[in-house]
């Protein structure tokens, strides 16, 4: 069945309203444009993100419902805390963003991944500009897990995560939630629910309350130096 999909104007960074996104496929909003920083920032500030495969035009999405974490409410299980104490893992922030993005791409087959070379370069540029950030989990100096995403005010828009060792992505999320909440962060956007996110405790909310929170928080200012490269440490009960 044919569908109508707006094409973005290459001369500006305007997007259709998110509520006009298709129901099937869920959230598909527009195509075209580019992955330049101005367009990416305009997209994320409206709850829109790119997601496409090699050989496809750039596709822009704003699905409903939306998967989120509330960082101040993330509670690790007793078993996860016990595992971490014995793991020898070290968790860092913004120490290896390019490697994290590359690992997220490599953990999927070329047919499955949406993290194309153009996407890798675009988010590396966003990192260089101070918008894209990564969390890394290290074991014996080897990168074994982590995730990356964009900060928009007090909202963190998660893009992808990977795990090469037991509980690595769970521990990365736990430490980041604690750090981000302490710095004034209020919301983590996970885009689309999946089994892994659900197992970590992600919630789903309708488009309207998600957009309301995003509009309220996208201009918020969190503490300075929140994303300088650092080792993340929290007291373990």
Curated annotation (Swiss-Prot):
<dbReference type="InterPro" id="IPR042203">
    <property type="entry name" value="Leu/Phe-tRNA_Trfase_C"/>
</dbReference>
<dbReference type="GO" id="GO:0030163">
    <property type="term" value="P:protein catabolic process"/>
</dbReference>
<dbReference type="InterPro" id="IPR016181">
    <property type="entry name" value="Acyl_CoA_acyltransferase"/>
</dbReference>
<keyword id="KW-0012">Acyltransferase</keyword>
<dbReference type="InterPro" id="IPR004616">
    <property type="entry name" value="Leu/Phe-tRNA_Trfase"/>
</dbReference>
<dbReference type="InterPro" id="IPR042221">
    <property type="entry name" value="Leu/Phe-tRNA_Trfase_N"/>
</dbReference>
<comment type="similarity">
    <text>Belongs to the L/F-transferase family.</text>
</comment>
<keyword id="KW-0963">Cytoplasm</keyword>
<keyword id="KW-0808">Transferase</keyword>
<dbReference type="GO" id="GO:0008914">
    <property type="term" value="F:leucyl-tRNA--protein transferase activity"/>
</dbReference>
<dbReference type="GO" id="GO:0005737">
    <property type="term" value="C:cytoplasm"/>
</dbReference>
<comment type="function">
    <text>Functions in the N-end rule pathway of protein degradation where it conjugates Leu, Phe and, less efficiently, Met from aminoacyl-tRNAs to the N-termini of proteins containing an N-terminal arginine or lysine.</text>
</comment>
<dbReference type="Pfam" id="PF03588">
    <property type="entry name" value="Leu_Phe_trans"/>
</dbReference>
<protein>
    <recommendedName>
        <fullName>Leucyl/phenylalanyl-tRNA--protein transferase</fullName>
        <ecNumber>2.3.2.6</ecNumber>
    </recommendedName>
</protein>
């Amino acid at each position: 069945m044919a569908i109508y999909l707006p094409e973005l104007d290459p001369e500006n960074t305007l997007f259709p309203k998110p509520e006009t996104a298709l129901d099937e496929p869920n959230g598909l909003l527009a195509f075209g444009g580019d992955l330049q920083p101005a367009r990416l920032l305009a997209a994320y500030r409206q709850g829109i993100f790119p997601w496409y495969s090699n050989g496809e035009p750039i596709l822009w999405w704003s699905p409903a419902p939306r998967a989120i974490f509330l960082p101040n409410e993330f509670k690790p299980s007793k078993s996860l805390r016990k595992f971490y104490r014995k793991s020898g893992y070290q968790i860092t922030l913004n120490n290896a963003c390019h490697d994290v993005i590359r690992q997220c791409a490599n953990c999927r087959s070329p047919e499955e991944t949406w993290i194309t070379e153009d996407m890798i370069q675009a988010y590396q540029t966003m990192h260089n500009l101070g918008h894209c950030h990564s969390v890394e989990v290290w074991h014996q100096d080897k990168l074994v897990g982590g995730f990356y995403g964009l900060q928009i005010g007090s909202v963190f828009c998660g893009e992808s995560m990977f795990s090469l060792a037991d509980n690595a992505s769970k521990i990365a999320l736990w430490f980041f939630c604690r750090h981000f909440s302490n710095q004034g962060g209020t919301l983590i956007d996970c885009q689309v629910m999946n089994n892994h996110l659900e197992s970590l405790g992600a919630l789903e909310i309708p488009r309207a309350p998600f957009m309301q929170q995003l509009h309220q928080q996208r201009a918020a200012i969190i503490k300075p130096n929140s994303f300088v490269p650092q080792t993340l440490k929290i007291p373990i009960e």
